[in-house]
Amino acid sequence: MATTALDLAKVRNIGIMAHIDAGKTTTTERILFYTGVNYKLGETHEGSATMDWMKEEQERGITITSAATTCRWNDTTINIIDTPGHVDFTIEVERSLRVLDGAVAVFDGKEGVEPQSEQVWRQADRYNVPRICFVNKMDKIGADFQRCVDMIRERLGANPLAVQLPIGAESDFQGVIDLIRMKAYVWSPDAPKGEMYDTIEIPDAYAEAAQEGHERLVEAVAEADDEIMELYLEGQEPTVEQLVAAIRRATISGAAVPVLCGSAFKNKGVQPLLDAIVAYLPSPLDIEAIEGHDPQDKDEEVTLQRKPSEEEPLAALAFKIMSDQHLGKLTYLRIYSGVLESGMQVLNSIKGRKERIGKIYRMHANKREEITRVGAGDIVAVVGLKDTTTGETLCDQANPIVLESMTFPAPVIEVAIEPKTKSDQEKLGTAIQRLAEEDPSFRVTTDEETGQTVISGMGELHLEVLVNRMREEFKVEANIGKPQVAYRETIRRKVEGVEYTHKKQTGGAGQYGRVVIDLEPLPIDGDGDSPGYEFVNNITGGRIPREYIPSVDAGCQEAAQFGVLAGYPLVGIKVTLQDGAYHDVDSSELAFKIAGSMAFKEAASKANPVLLEPVMAVEVTTPEEYMGDVIGDLNSRRGQIQSMEERAGTRVVKALVPLSEMFGYVGDLRSRTQGRANYTMVFHSYAEVPSNVSQEIVAKARGE
């Protein structure tokens, strides 16, 4: 079935975001059950949930990959992007937030707003995603709806609108009161799967609380919406339609967040949640036109726009790549404008290459339905793309556009991985290639000295999951090293006239090459990734023939790969070749390469070499009472506090801390703050290691 522009008002692209145990997967499962996609309820406890379809996730009970699932509620199509709730996977959360129009934030009725939910909420703020809240697990001992609403206001700085009240609490939780229509919905014990619920008048015991709740709601909506404010000032009661329309406007503009409640596990409250998704969250038509730039316009000075219409030229964003055992590589696309048909040729505007669209599928968690055409505003998976990776744009060849590219942070933690057998070596190659396609925050390098494969990622859990996927999906048996920090070396002073002569005489042609070099430090740009290497040739009068100069350069570069202190790459160096000598018969490229390499090593060891380490920008969000502890701990990790600020009722500490001091930080921070603080960490720059620490690292590297 192809959606047409007329249907766009009836499409919702939503994500379900939550803290790790708030019941996100269960809530998604129930949505799929009530919309008729699933006929047996999948429980995360049993490891059978439809959305968590990678074996990894079923074992851990956490959701890692955002599978996109399509379902229908009444006459509305809902595309659900399942987002991971763990901090190491924030890259996936960010990626899915880009392609959503709205989100449902699920909270645990007992725990309320947990640290991870704060982090995901801030990311959603960054992308201006309108959302509604579902306070789940209302049947749990200690569940408190009002406390959750207060926490959403205080901790997240949001403006919550309680549109429901719970009937009963904990094990007596029976249903909800609709504060807009002033009715009660009660789930009868006779329908254990919750398909049936009765709409009744509000029970007397709740009449007063419901009336107060309704008045509070109208008052809060009036503050966020001029139309209701006028009625309110005139003393008129808004109709249900007026109230719903005003809440929708306030939700889409970000002025307010409707809050609902229920228990997904006990099958209560999910149908009203579906009604709220349709009523309050935006359709693709409510979202502003997406912006991008012309691929030729390198400075991105001119902004191009694409409106969500089939009349506009095609623009689609690849937001997820997955491998399917039967179909091969699946690329998930969000179509922002135009139409996509199977067999069509489109342009990948980032790489400037053409791609042919194979089959197009609408995905239902782990089942799929083939379609031939898809229009603006929809989310689908396509087969047959050769060159497209995550974050790239596919567009009409005649109207190229690059939708803002997603920036991926550089990985900060690495482990060596060693295949056990020859056949594991081959499997490892395939696994690494596939995983790197799916996840741009995962990088692979080879350590030239040890020949080991080194994989790097965003955190300890991130790497653990990747390694487990290699074992499970690709059957790679491998030994895994300990996580390591990527150090660098540089020099601090200039040395001049360092001479080295390489000569070897063993009957017949020998080897001969003499070089004289200067070595001086270059300013290192902070990312430490810059090779920071320059080579200047000052040879005159043919003292070294021109054809041997590149060999001297190559020798110096090779030597720079393994520094003189602890064998880490040397950066920020300028080599000047000043003088030399050659022999008509015995000189060769190899002789000059060796001479260059040896002269470089000698010069570097005289040039006051120092060790550099990656320093991370760490941002800790903590309740005020733990502030002193958090700062003291960061100082003990050689951290430099940069700033402290208040944000939505919590304190934010920003500091620069060496990565080597951050291992195991997540556990320490949790225990210091009872799990209430959270942190983010991104690479900041390379900085010199203090000499006492440097001596330890060097001794360790030399095996002393």
Curated annotation (Swiss-Prot):
It comes from Thermobifida fusca (strain YX). HAMAP family: EF_G_EF_2_B (MF_00054_B). Belongs to the TRAFAC class translation factor GTPase superfamily. Classic translation factor GTPase family. EF-G/EF-2 subfamily. GTP binds at residues 18-25, 82-86, 136-139. GO terms for biological process: ribosome disassembly. The gene is fusA. GO terms for cellular component: cytoplasm. InterPro entries: EF-G-like_DII, EFG_II, EFG_III, EFG_III/V, EFG_IV, EFG_V, EFG_V-like, G_TR_CS. The keyword Repeat does not apply. NCBIfam families: EF-G, PRK12740.1-3, PRK12740.1-5, small_GTP. GO terms for molecular function: GTP binding; GTPase activity; translation elongation factor activity. It comes from the Bacteria. This is Elongation factor G. Residues 9-285 form the tr-type G domain. Catalyzes the GTP-dependent ribosomal translocation step during translation elongation. During this step, the ribosome changes from the pre-translocational (PRE) to the post-translocational (POST) state as the newly formed A-site-bound peptidyl-tRNA and P-site-bound deacylated tRNA move to the P and E sites, respectively. Catalyzes the coordinated movement of the two tRNA molecules, the mRNA and conformational changes in the ribosome. Keywords: Cytoplasm, Elongation factor, GTP-binding, Nucleotide-binding, Protein biosynthesis. It is found in: Cytoplasm.
